[in-house]
Amino acid sequence: MRATWLSAMAVAILAFAQISYSFSLDDFHIRDSSSHESHVQAMTTTGTADVPIWRVNDNWMYDGFLDVGDFVADSGVSTNVETLDGSLDRTVEDIYLMEIGGKETLVYEVESVGEYESDGAIQIDGTSGCLYVDMQTIEIIRVSDLATYSQEVTVDVYFDPLFFGCAAWLRQDIGELVVENTYEPPLENYDFPISVGESWRMDYEQATDYSGSSNYVDIPEDSSDSNSTSWSVVSQGNSGVAYPGCYQSFNVTAYDSDGEETGYNWFCPAVRGEVKSTMEQAFGFLAVHELVSYQPVQRGKLVSIDVQYPLSPTDIEISAWINVT
């Protein structure tokens, strides 16, 4: 029964692995997909946030946890595990062009590395030990609006039985699993500029490919589904995370096709990303992360010049506007 529960947990965690520009592109390179509709309805607001510009090596660090309490309660297994605590390290690794929907599209490649573990020894059907989950996520995100084109997640789940402490030398590898989700068109988690009261909906195709190896977990079959998701900017204010510059963040809440809430992001313009996120995953998992550190790459000065008359005779006096940021 313990192995069965751990297997189910591994599969559930696997499902967890479900934002006019001016660029100084020192690193730039080229790497296919169809057209669908997104529906936007806008309302009045008191503040807005435009699409941020990321740089290679921009980094966000989060503390967080996976709340597995509801899943455990429904599993029928005797255990005292409630959450797996950990951290998430998110970095912009690259910027390049790739083919999306028949068009050359500028994208970010973003890597997230998460490490989670039980709070000391737990019990699963009478066996004590520590449960660990390591995750690596590679996301391809469209530069123009931070829409997600794909996510590839590698999940490593293992259990250390208790023997004078949690014994790594007795470690049981539950499995290493890989899941890749591709969204066509890319999933618009934000509709910039963000403003309170705005809502939008997308119909899209989601292709999911599975691979990996495990002695306990059956690797799921690949799938392709039609889905619909909607979002709403429900408020602007304090997310509850005391991070400097983020006291006027935007709460963007997501809903499934039945109108059920599936999670939310608190978008903070000052950190060019989320200060807090809460997402309900398959099997009742809840993933919660809060920002603890934002390390942007130093932005260089950008000079733009506009002239009164782009075409004019030589040797005449015209006006020009110079902007330095």
Write out the residue ranges for each language-model feature.
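Aromatic/hydrophobic beta-strand junction motif of beta-rich domains
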Residues: 318-324
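Acidic, serine/threonine-rich low-complexity disordered tracts
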Residues: 23-136, 145, 172-315
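Cleavable N-terminal signal peptides
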Residues: 9, 20-22
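Hydrophobic core
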Residues: 14-18
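Sec-dependent N-terminal signal peptides
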Residues: 2-13
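Low-complexity, serine/threonine/proline-enriched polar segments
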Residues: 133, 137-172
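Poly-acidic low-complexity segments
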Residues: 2, 20, 66-67, 142
